[in-house]
Curated annotation (Swiss-Prot):
One of its GO terms (cellular component) is cytoplasmic side of plasma membrane. The keyword Protein biosynthesis does not apply. Interacts with PEBP1; in response to IL13/interleukin-13, prevents the interaction of PEBP1 with RAF1 to activate the ERK signaling cascade. Binds 1 Fe cation per subunit. Residues 116-663 form the Lipoxygenase domain. Signal peptide: none annotated. InterPro entries: LipOase, LipOase_C, LipOase_C_sf, LipOase_CS, LipOase_Fe_BS, LipOase_mml, PLAT/LH2_dom, PLAT/LH2_dom_sf. This is Polyunsaturated fatty acid lipoxygenase ALOX15. Belongs to the lipoxygenase family. Fe cation binds at H361, H366, H541, H545, I663. It catalyses: (5Z,8Z,11Z,14Z)-eicosatetraenoate + O2 = (12S)-hydroperoxy-(5Z,8Z,10E,14Z)-eicosatetraenoate; (5Z,8Z,11Z,14Z)-eicosatetraenoate + O2 = (15S)-hydroperoxy-(5Z,8Z,11Z,13E)-eicosatetraenoate; (9Z,12Z)-octadecadienoate + O2 = (13S)-hydroperoxy-(9Z,11E)-octadecadienoate; (5Z,8Z,11Z,14Z)-eicosatetraenoate + 2 O2 = (14R,15S)-dihydroperoxy-(5Z,8Z,10E,12E)-eicosatetraenoate. GO terms for biological process: apoptotic cell clearance; arachidonate metabolic process; bone mineralization; cellular response to calcium ion; cellular response to interleukin-13; fatty acid oxidation; hepoxilin biosynthetic process; linoleic acid metabolic process.
């Protein structure tokens, strides 16, 4: 009983407002009241009004929302609704929404503090939780894009997605405008791309046009240098292949006359300074055929040594695995003729591009994040604190992945047109890479320890990833401790357990044999798992994504395809090198897609800076505030460090890390 002050916030995207009328009801623990027709929401605004309620409501639990139209449906994007009352001394309640209100269906928004099923001992939200999840499970269904790969949302086009998972208008316009620019550039450059082969490495400058970064310029000038080649395994676009050697790889069969190399490798191994990058996943993958022309793949092994000054130098490259009964493949070294050594390094760089895009970027970034997104929508109601914690980091992931499946890795998509793994090989590689997707590999403290990278002063990816993980983990623990006081509370939360099980057993297709948990038994284990989810959707994806425009724009440093087989003899010439590297048309397509995927986004939310307030309670706000302060401090620390580096490492600066997989 008394006067309630109502505030309603509408989103700022182009079509967030609505000409339709909005009706509201207040639902309290002891009663409910219809507020009637109140307003027509305007974009990027707050509506405020007071309503005299005659009923006694008690503590508020929900706001019920219904939009009504007479002639034309006009969707409304509601941010939140705030209610204070009764009277000026009454409590203030916030009801987060952050979704589209469509048609005339009724939407119940629970009060925003959030609670677990264990905390909801009176069952005040029980029916709402069950009804919301039932509706969500019908909207968000698992799909299987290709047999043998992890699951995805059941949507073959953007129109199949629930509207809340689609790009909002500003994001959509910016993304599609970039696609148009890339297509126009390909058409404009087509006449000069009709030649079948570049004549010299300098010819790649024809497609190295405006839009590149300062780092891409550095790559163009330094890509032949051995130290620069080795640096990329530590801090380049794909720092996920390198590991410290604990023994000489079994595949490393030395041809006659290479006893000195073997002795050198043994010596580096004893000192603990021997490292390897093994691209064995590419072995046996069928190479693409582009415009009736056979393309080629290799499965290189690179052996590198760590110098006292921190430089990582390549000392041996084997391009193919030995075959039983065949002559061992050649091992290339820096002592070989310069053209042979350069060609071998080009093969490694091409192989690294294939694994980067398919394993490190698509699988470990996009597809795994999509599993988290679908499972979260299916298993955690909006009132659940873990839903509130995760949902800002799942924004736009489903749509960007639908676009990837329809434009990039589909039949006649980008991979088929220009990548040596296209034409079906990319699907086989995804399946093989999925078999090596372990839980520990998604957790930097475990992954970096397993790969022996924690004590390398010049591995800035490792340093920044570990620090960022620790900041995220403290944030997750801070939020988690507000809602789970004991390990038993974790075990008794059947929604949380169902979510974890659905990720591991269904989305990741039985990943428990690769270390993923099917249940969460303690607060520490749950926080580790949730930190892994957030890190994967933010920092890990950005560490792989942000380097594309730097490292892949100069085509010889990351050839999208190779047009001659891997060399079996050491007799390379410039003509052979140029006949192997991508032709003009392939080069143009590569840099256009690299620009589209790797450019800095005009519509981008930095890590932790989401405007949505899913936790309106002061305790949770304090945890988020501390998280943002720690991110700002780490960002400043990295900025200061980078000033003293010859090559700044910025891919894990919190201000550049995107808050979700949205590109």
């Amino acid at each position: 009983m008394g006067v309630y002050r109502i505030r309603v916030s509408t989103g700022d995207s182009v079509y967030a407002g609505s000409n339709n009328e909005v009706y509201l009801w207040l639902i309290g623990q002891h009663g409910e009241a219809s507020l009637g027709k109140l307003f027509r929401p305007c974009r990027n605004s707050e509506a405020e009004f007071k309503v005299d309620v005659s009923e006694y409501l008690g503590p508020l639990l929900f706001v019920r929302v219904q939009k009504w139209h007479y002639l034309k449906e006009d969707a409304w994007f509601c941010n939140w609704i705030s209610v204070k009352g009764p009277g000026d001394q009454g409590s203030e309640y916030t009801f987060p929404c952050y979704r589209w209100v469509q048609g005339t269906s009724i939407l119940n928004l629970p009060e925003g503090t959030g609670c677990t099923v264990v905390e909801d001992s009176q069952g005040l939200f029980r029916n709402h939780r069950e009804e919301e999840l039932e509706e969500r499970r019908s909207l968000y269904r698992w799909g299987n894009w290709k047999d043998g790969t992890i699951l995805n949302v059941a949507a073959t086009s953007i129109s199949d997605l629930p509207v809340d998972q689609r790009f909002r208008e500003d994001k959509r316009l910016e993304f599609e405008a970039s696609q148009v620019l890339g297509t126009m550039d390909t058409v404009i450059n087509f006449p000069k791309n009709t030649v079948t082969c570049w004549k010299s490495l300098d010819d790649f400058n024809y497609v190295f046009k405006s839009g590149h970064t300062k780092m891409a310029e550095r790559v163009r000038n330094s890509w032949k240098e051995d130290a620069f080649f080795g640096y990329q395994f530590l801090n380049g676009a794909n720092p996920m292949v390198l590991k410290r050697s604990t023994c000489l790889p079994a595949r490393l069969v030395f041809p006659p006359g290479m006893e000195k190399l073997q002795a050198q490798l043994d010596e580096e191994l004893k000192k603990g300074t021997l490292f390897e990058a093994d691209f064995f996943l590419l072995d046996g993958i069928k190479a693409n055929v582009i415009l009736c022309s056979q393309q080629y793949l290799a499965a290189p092994l690179v052996m590198l040594k760590l110098q006292p000054d921190g430089q990582l130098l390549p000392i041996a490259i084997q391009l193919e695995l030995p075959k039983t009964g065949s002559t061992p493949p050649p091992i290339f070294t820096p002592l070989d003729p310069p053209m042979d050594w350069l060609l071998a390094k080009c093969w490694v760089r091409s192989s690294d591009l294939q694994l980067h895009e398919l394993q490190a970027h698509l699988l470990r970034g996009h597809l795994v994040a999509e599993v988290f997104a679908v499972a979260t929508m299916r298993c955690l109601p909006s009132v659940h604190p873990v839903f509130k914690l995760l949902v800002p980091h799942l924004l736009y992931t489903m749509e960007i992945n639908v676009r990837a499946r329809s434009d990039l890795i589909s039949e006649r998509g980008f991979f088929d047109k220009v990548m040596s793994t296209g034409g079906g090989g990319h699907l086989d590689l995804l399946k093989q890479a999925g078999a090596f997707l372990t839980y520990s590999s998604l957790c930097p403290p475990d992954d970096l320890a397993e790969r022996g990278l924690l004590d390398i002063d010049t591995c800035f990816y490792a340093k920044d990833a570990l620090q960022l993980w620790q900041v995220m983990n403290r944030y997750v623990v801070g939020m988690f401790d507000l809602y789970y006081k004991t390990d038993q509370a974790v075990q008794d939360d059947y929604e949380l357990q169902s979510w974890c099980q659905e990720i591991t057993e269904i989305g990741l297709q039985g990943a428990q044999d690769r270390g993923f948990p099917t249940s969460l038994q303690s607060r520490a284990q749950a926080c580790h798992f949730i930190t892994m989810c957030i890190f994967t959707c933010t920092a890990q994806h950005s560490s792989i994504h942000l380097g594309q425009l730097d490292w892949f724009y100069w085509v010889p440093n990351a050839p999208c395809t190779m047009r001659l087989p891997p060399p079996k003899t050491k007799d390379a010439t410039m003509e052979k090198l140029m006949a192997t590297l991508p032709n003009p048309n392939q080069s143009t397509l590569q840099i256009n897609v690299v620009w589209l995927l790797g450019r800095r986004q005009a519509v981008m939310v930095p890590l932790g800076q989401h405007s949505e307030e899913h936790f309106p309670n002061p305790e949770a706000k304090a945890v988020l505030k501390k998280f943002r302060e720690e991110l700002a401090a780490l960002d400043k620390e990295i900025e200061i460090r980078n000033k003293s580096l010859d090559i700044p490492y910025e891919y894990l600066r919190p201000s550049l890390v995107e808050n979700s997989v949205a590109i």
